[in-house]
Design a protein with these regions (language model features):
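Sec-exported extracytoplasmic/periplasmic mature domains
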Residues: 34-42, 57, 61-66, 128-138, ...
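Loop/turn elements at helix/coil->beta-strand transitions in domains of secreted/extracellular proteins
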Residues: 63, 92-96, 139-144, 180-184, ...
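Active-site-adjacent substrate-binding region
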Residues: 48, 69-73, 184, 191-298
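Acidic/histidine-rich catalytic neighborhood of metal-dependent amide-processing enzymes
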Residues: 113-214, 223, 228-236
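Bacterial N-terminal signal peptides
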Residues: 5-15
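N-terminal capping segment at the start of a domain
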Residues: 21-53, 107, 257-275
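Structural recognition of the beta-strand scaffold that forms the well-ordered cores
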Residues: 35, 85, 95-99, 144-147, ...
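A non-catalytic alpha/beta surface segment that caps or lines the substrate-entry region
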Residues: 31-91
Length: 298
């Protein structure tokens, strides 16, 4: 009986493994990021943000794309924000969510900050992941890609001035019952750095962080994961707080730390395309696709 069950599990997984056997292209993800950065700064109310939103609409024009527009109360007054949700249906009853934020820092609106690693790289990552999902009904859970608006603080980071898009969507999905269907929420942030070193996030769900590390080991990428840990406040938090098993896949150490850049290139005009690496995006993409497979096997 045990042998039969094992064989059945293997046979059930074969279509999923075969369907995702095509190699993830970090080069394609980087090209998507380049096109996204070409929109310019993407802060609320900017032409660059409108360009970025139109870019996402164009990329997902033939997919099941939903715009989630709402008005957020911010320290500078009401602001209209828009999340994007792209649904790829699966045969199993449940949802895996892969997410990123796509806008840039509002307080840096008078600088040349374009968030190449902070928003654009992860947008490129999800766009390339979409190429591995579309065109068929997935054999496992449905996979939803979410692009959050309003992750950044409008004035100064606090519980009420940050994570606007994720707080809104988590609350909305709690009311309509979507949260109960989520088997895993995987957030991507700052993962295009040439010197990739993903941090273990202690504010995430330990079991899902463990699953991501297992995916890194299975894909031969463990050397880039979890050498250190940090208690990050990020778009996973509103979901963790509502009981959704979640991971935050983030490289918090970005660029040299010196007197001029105490936080490295994070939130500086130096966060530019030349700091990104197709190899790092390939590593991240492989781990995300393997994490989907592992979640489906659970």
């Amino acid at each position: 009986m045990r042998r039969f069950c094992l064989l059945a599990v293997v046979l059930l997984q074969l279509p999923l493994l075969h369907a995702q056997a095509v190699q993830f292209s970090g080069a394609k993800a980087l090209e998507y990021a380049r096109q996204f950065v070409a929109c310019g700064p993407r802060f609320n109310g900017s032409a660059g943000l409108l360009c970025a939103q139109n870019y996402l609409k164009k990329q997902f024009a033939h997919d099941n794309l939903q715009e989630d527009t709402f008005v957020a109360s911010t320290p500078v007054g009401p602001q209209e924000l828009t999340n994007f949700i792209v649904r790829f249906p699966g045969k199993k009853d449940g949802i895996i969510v892969l997410a990123t934020h796509y806008e840039t820092n509002y307080p840096l609106r008078n600088t040349s900050f374009v968030g190449a690693n902070d928003g654009a790289a992860t947008t490129g990552l999800l766009l390339e992941i979409a190429n591995h999902l579309r065109g068929r009904t997935l054999d496992g859970y449905s996979v939803w890609l979410v692009f959050f608006d309003g992750e950044e603080a409008v004035q100064s980071w606090s519980n009420s001035d940050s994570l606007y898009g994720s707080r809104h969507l988590a609350a909305k999905w709690q009311v309509d019952g979507t949260l109960k269907k989520i088997k895993g929420f995987l957030l991507a942030d700052m993962i295009g750095d040439r010197d990739l070193d993903i941090t273990r996030v202690t504010t995430a769900t330990p079991a899902i962080e463990d699953l991501v590390y297992e995916a890194a080991k299975k894909t031969g990428n463990a050397s880039h994961f979890f050498k250190d840990e940090a208690a990050e406040e990020d778009d996973h938090l509103p979901f963790v707080q509502r009981g959704v098993p979640s991971a935050d896949v983030i490289d918090v150490d970005y660029g040299p730390h010196d007197a001029e850049h105490p936080d490295g290139w994070h939130h500086t005009p130096e966060d530019t395309l030349d700091k990104l690496s197709a190899k790092s995006l390939t590593i991240s993409g492989e781990v995300f696709l393997e994490s989907i497979r592992l979640l489906n096997a659970h």
